[in-house]
Amino acid sequence: MFFFNIIDIIFLGDKLMKKLIRFLIIILLIVVYIYRTEIISFSVTTVTDNIKVDPPSSNNYKKDYTFAFASNTDNFHPKNKQDIINILYTTLNSGEDDFSFYCTRDYSTCLDDIKDISQNQDLLSTINNMVSPYNSYKKLYITTSTYGKANIKIDKLYTDDEIVMINNKIEEIKSKIINTNMSTEDMLKAYHDYLINNTVYDEAAAEEIKINNSQNKKNNSHKAIGPLFEGMALCSGYSDAMKIFIDELNIPNYKISTQSHVWNVLYLNGKWLHIDLTWDDPVTSNHSNVLLHNYFLIDANTLLSLDMTSHNFNKSYYPELN
């Protein structure tokens, strides 16, 4: 009798243990279900924190320039907003058209910051203006996943055929107007004068943009093709062509823009100086071709003393110009 009681107790204990285990499993499953997002997020971000990201591949138009607003980076796990800006700049500057990077677990606002940056067209335009026109975007797509992966896709402004065509034209122009005895300032002036003497401002395209807030997609006045091949340009066409010339001289430079205008700025002899071809090629009532040098290699104070409307740039984007 005593023997059977022991067996019964053991059997009962075994049943209770099985029930307890089942109960604990159910509780565990409930907890996992309730916190499934957090658990998955923790697991995935732990993995993404350790994913090795190689730098974007570089083409011939990448520049090793470092600016106050953005610089090249080899850190593709951002820890703050500036890191994201540097990743965007590095990707564009490299000439890459598809690149991914990853948020880290300890950067809790990373995805929100990427979204904010992707919706800030002024900021994106500023980064775009700092790279070679050949690497600049026509359209930029930035997407994110819930678990920290960000992807950049770039639809470039210039096609490969257009780049070859422009480069051939640049070499042709250089052979005619540049010689080895010229100083850097002389070469800059030669490029400035050539573009103005062979280009007129495209008033029709400017009026179309003013009315429709867009321009004919077949019109090339907003690109270097306009002034170099068609003799017509908007401010973006002048500045793209001039930037390509300045890049040939390996001078740190970028385009600078406001809501209504864009021009060039470069670092020469220890100073940041502005060049505005559009305003040195004024539209006249009799359509005569006028060449000015009012906006050639001038500092920011002189620039703003000449015009405070179209040239009133956002100083927070260009700290070196203050």
Language-model features: where?
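N-terminal Sec-pathway targeting helices
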Residues: 11-29
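Alpha-helical and coiled-coil interaction segments, frequently adjacent to or embedded
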Residues: 91, 286-322
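Hydrophobic alpha-helical membrane-insertion segments, chiefly the h-region
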Residues: 28-37
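Short hydrophobic targeting helices and cationic amphipathic motifs
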Residues: 3-4, 12
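Intrinsically disordered, low-complexity N-terminal segments that are enriched in acidic
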Residues: 39-153
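Flexible, surface-exposed loop/gating regions in the mature catalytic domains
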Residues: 201-255, 263, 279
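Hydrophobic/aromatic-rich core segments of domains that either
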Residues: 236-303
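Secondary-structure boundary elements
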Residues: 158-227
